[in-house]
């Protein structure tokens, strides 16, 4: 089984080396081939150059460097399209570079995806935990998730999770040109399409650790985009 991991980055020079090392130490032995795709928005801290240097040590690392900060969702679009067009893989993972997602959990995702179109590492199923969030952050996340589930009619407990695995044929059915969100609302738009196509997913427990290094990708414009997207789903089936 061949696996690709798409990782968007913006000022992740401090966190990326450890993540890449863990992926090649812990996940590469489980698969026939491992490809890592870094999508960097021209980070001022030199993340893209660092990723290229890591590629000299760890084989099969591709770096897509974009001209400016263009958003998390746009990064995933570019990363997924790169994988679908240029790489021969069976499974595709999306994850953050900031240590909030545990690479070792990819193993259980590989095991469970056999009977499903996609897997979500969920913060809201038994066995999950969240480390480092205060009450306000917990509330904001819960409200956003509830609004997304209600508006898009998605039967997923953690629709905003950014740690996911897809079968290649699942992503091939996603119409990326119909996804208008460049930010984190992209996560909801993908799930909405998968639901429309009757593709079944599974949520597995995760331990989510709030980022302690690097730079957050969340901004006010992304929140507004999320609200606009949710309103667009009202009235749709």
Feature-to-residue mapping (PLM):
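Catalytic donor-sugar/metal-binding loop of nucleotide-sugar-dependent glycosyltransferases
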Residues: 154-155, 178-182, 191-208
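Short beta-strand/loop segment that forms part of the nucleotide-sugar
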Residues: 32-43, 64-65
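Short, well-formed alpha-helical segments that are part of the catalytic scaffolds
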Residues: 12-27
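Cell-envelope/extracellular polymer assembly enzymes that use nucleotide-activated donors
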Residues: 2-4, 35, 189
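Donor nucleotide-sugar binding loop of glycosyltransferases
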Residues: 12-15, 43, 102
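A conserved acidic beta->alpha catalytic loop
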Residues: 40-49, 68, 99
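Short beta-strand-to-loop acidic/aromatic patch adjacent to the donor-nucleotide binding site
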Residues: 88-100
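Acceptor/aglycone-binding surface of glycosyltransferases and processive sugar-polymer synthases
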Residues: 64-82, 91, 103-184, 211-221, ...
